[in-house]
Amino acid sequence: MHTTQKDTTYTKIFVGGLPYHTTDSSLRKYFEVFGDIEEAVVITDRQTGKSRGYGFVTMADRAAAERACKDPNPIIDGRKANVNLAYLGAKPRIMQPGFAFGVQQLHPALIQRPFGIPAHYVYPQAFVQPGVVIPHVQPAAAAASTTPYIGYTGAAYAQYSAAAAAYEQYPYAASPAAAAGYVAAGGYGYAVQQPITAAAPGTAAAAAAAFGQYQPQQLQTDRMQ
């Protein structure tokens, strides 16, 4: 007479994450609170006889198996285990909210700007004087600005520009108009940069007084011959 094998699809439980010291009896002791147990087996290593970290428990009925699988964080022999119906396999690990990709949300205003830098920290365009680089700032914006990285007002920039226009006289140029091109002197050519447009007459006079110690160099007739 052949015995019919009982269907264990909904009663056989896979138990993973077991410590090395877990035995059949300790595994049975944990699951017997959920109902009657038909079998509890820990898979062991043949050479060492210690647990390989998983086992199987067959409950007497489906309801008992469902109760045993309800706990999302079962602790067996002091270690968190993975309990699920055997035909479903091991449960996927659930990431804790505190460990899920800790990327801080950026403010929309920072995302719209390049590299997430506030607008007043972006380097402005620059005017290039001979040997001097002066950041270009509008007078109204410079007066209203409170950032510590801009220590000059619009009037100071205009004053410096006017002084630079009065000071930058080139020793190899006969006049400022001739400085726009190449001036030949003694068989050599000198590339001369044209200074930017001077500021208002009143500002230029004040700048010339402030920078009076810088006198234009006098042209020597013997160099121009």
UniProtKB/Swiss-Prot annotation:
GO biological process terms on file: 3'-UTR-mediated mRNA destabilization; cell differentiation; DNA damage response; mRNA destabilization; mRNA processing; mRNA stabilization; negative regulation of cytoplasmic translation; positive regulation of 3'-UTR-mediated mRNA stabilization
Main location (coarse class): nucleus
Name of the protein in question: RNA-binding protein 24
InterPro entries: Nucleotide-bd_a/b_plait_sf (IPR012677), RBD_domain_sf (IPR035979), RNA-binding_reg (IPR050886), RRM_dom (IPR000504)
Entry GO CC: cytoplasm; cytosol; nucleus
Top-rank lineage group of the source organism: Eukaryota
Statement: the UniProt record of this protein carries the keyword Transcription regulation: no
Keyword vocabulary terms for this entry: Cytoplasm, Differentiation, mRNA processing, mRNA splicing, Nucleus, RNA-binding, Translation regulation
Places the protein is found: Nucleus; Cytoplasm
Domain RRM: 11-88
GO MF terms held by the record: mRNA 3'-UTR AU-rich region binding; mRNA 3'-UTR binding; mRNA CDS binding; pre-mRNA intronic binding; sequence-specific mRNA binding
